[in-house]
């Protein structure tokens, strides 16, 4: 796996003074109810504000793969907290393949958020998956989503997990990440 880097080629996990960042991951549902959005935005912002207060000299990085729903909600809140909170985007697969998940305004929003991120990383194929197999909806693609969830858990010191109370057993969803 290659080291993550920003557009200028630096490693986003290293601050100018070589301070170790506090890495915050996010996982949750894609279909956030409209009536819950404002409350969830406030809750995520409160987490960032609290962390900035407790660790004022520590860089904060949010890891978000920018899926619709929770990932983008947290990413937008993080971007509103710049420069204290920076956004880094681990992608579950090549960007062109991942973009097949999004249409119209959603695709435009994904590209806009990715363009505002500090950097991104396309994760390698999960063992046994093929570059053609992940292009179709199904188990190979689901394993890539699970892989990005595992990456976020492994790299994060804090995990923000939003759940609507509905149980699912989907591979790569919030439940399999947490």
Walk through the language-model features, giving the residues of each.
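Acidic/glycine-enriched connector segments
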Residues: 2-178
């Amino acid at each position: 796996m290659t080291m993550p880097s920003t557009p200028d080629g630096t490693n986003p996990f290293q601050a100018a003074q070589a301070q170790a960042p506090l890495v915050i991951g996010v996982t949750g549902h894609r279909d956030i109810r409209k009536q819950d959005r404002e409350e969830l935005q406030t809750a995520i912002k409160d987490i960032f504000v609290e962390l900035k207060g407790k660790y004022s000299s520590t860089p904060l990085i949010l890891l978000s793969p920018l899926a619709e729903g929770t990932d983008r909600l947290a990413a937008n809140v993080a971007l509103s907290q710049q420069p204290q909170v920076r956004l880094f985007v681990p992608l579950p697969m090549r960007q062109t393949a991942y973009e097949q998940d999004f249409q119209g305004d959603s695709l435009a929003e994904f590209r806009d958020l990715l363009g505002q991120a500090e950097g991104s990383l396309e994760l390698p194929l999960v063992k046994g998956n093929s570059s053609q197999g992940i292009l179709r909806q199904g188990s190979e693609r689901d394993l890539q989503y699970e892989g990005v969830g595992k990456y976020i858990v492994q790299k994060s010191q804090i995990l923000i997990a939003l759940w609507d109370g509905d149980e699912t057993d989907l591979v790569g969803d919030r439940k399999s990440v947490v």
